[in-house]
Amino acid sequence: MEVILKQDVEKLGHQGDVVKVAEGYGRNYLLPKKLAIEATAANKAVIEQMKAAAVRRIAREKTDAESLAKQFDGVTVTFTRRAGESNQLFGSVTTSDIATELEHKGFKLDRRKLSLVEPIKTTGDFKVALKLHRDVTVDIPVHVAKEAEVAAQ
């Protein structure tokens, strides 16, 4: 089944793309959630108009994302956690923790925009990618320290 995406769908395509999907995926997920429409000749003409508007919107969003990215310069997120002798954390630091800490610093964002392959389970310095726009990604430094080390300082 061919569908036209009405908005970006992760791992499938961007708004306005004509993609081939399984019948069930199209009829049971994409169409009911209004993420896509069937690829007919009439719909393709409508999508061309939507693409023109989308190009302007995407340019504006990219500009906004770039200005927001500049605000993240010099921002470091620091966590103190209990850890064992081998610097293994009792627990972990997740994207949710990082998003909450960034919110305390005045940045309101969705935790799903943070890219962390797996939760941080050791002390040290890490980089977490924050995807503000499909063309704008910022690396945020994350420092995880042992509770005893912080108390000693």
Swiss-Prot record:
<dbReference type="InterPro" id="IPR020069">
    <property type="entry name" value="Ribosomal_bL9_C"/>
</dbReference>
<keyword id="KW-0694">RNA-binding</keyword>
<dbReference type="GO" id="GO:0006412">
    <property type="term" value="P:translation"/>
</dbReference>
<keyword id="KW-0689">Ribosomal protein</keyword>
<keyword id="KW-0699">rRNA-binding</keyword>
<comment type="function">
    <text>Binds to the 23S rRNA.</text>
</comment>
<dbReference type="GO" id="GO:0003735">
    <property type="term" value="F:structural constituent of ribosome"/>
</dbReference>
<dbReference type="Pfam" id="PF03948">
    <property type="entry name" value="Ribosomal_L9_C"/>
</dbReference>
<dbReference type="GO" id="GO:0019843">
    <property type="term" value="F:rRNA binding"/>
</dbReference>
<dbReference type="GO" id="GO:0005840">
    <property type="term" value="C:ribosome"/>
</dbReference>
<dbReference type="InterPro" id="IPR020070">
    <property type="entry name" value="Ribosomal_bL9_N"/>
</dbReference>
<dbReference type="InterPro" id="IPR000244">
    <property type="entry name" value="Ribosomal_bL9"/>
</dbReference>
<keyword id="KW-0687">Ribonucleoprotein</keyword>
<comment type="similarity">
    <text>Belongs to the bacterial ribosomal protein bL9 family.</text>
</comment>
<dbReference type="InterPro" id="IPR036935">
    <property type="entry name" value="Ribosomal_bL9_N_sf"/>
</dbReference>
<dbReference type="InterPro" id="IPR009027">
    <property type="entry name" value="Ribosomal_bL9/RNase_H1_N"/>
</dbReference>
<dbReference type="InterPro" id="IPR020594">
    <property type="entry name" value="Ribosomal_bL9_bac/chp"/>
</dbReference>
<dbReference type="GO" id="GO:1990904">
    <property type="term" value="C:ribonucleoprotein complex"/>
</dbReference>
<protein>
    <recommendedName>
        <fullName>Large ribosomal subunit protein bL9</fullName>
    </recommendedName>
</protein>
<dbReference type="InterPro" id="IPR036791">
    <property type="entry name" value="Ribosomal_bL9_C_sf"/>
</dbReference>
<dbReference type="Pfam" id="PF01281">
    <property type="entry name" value="Ribosomal_L9_N"/>
</dbReference>
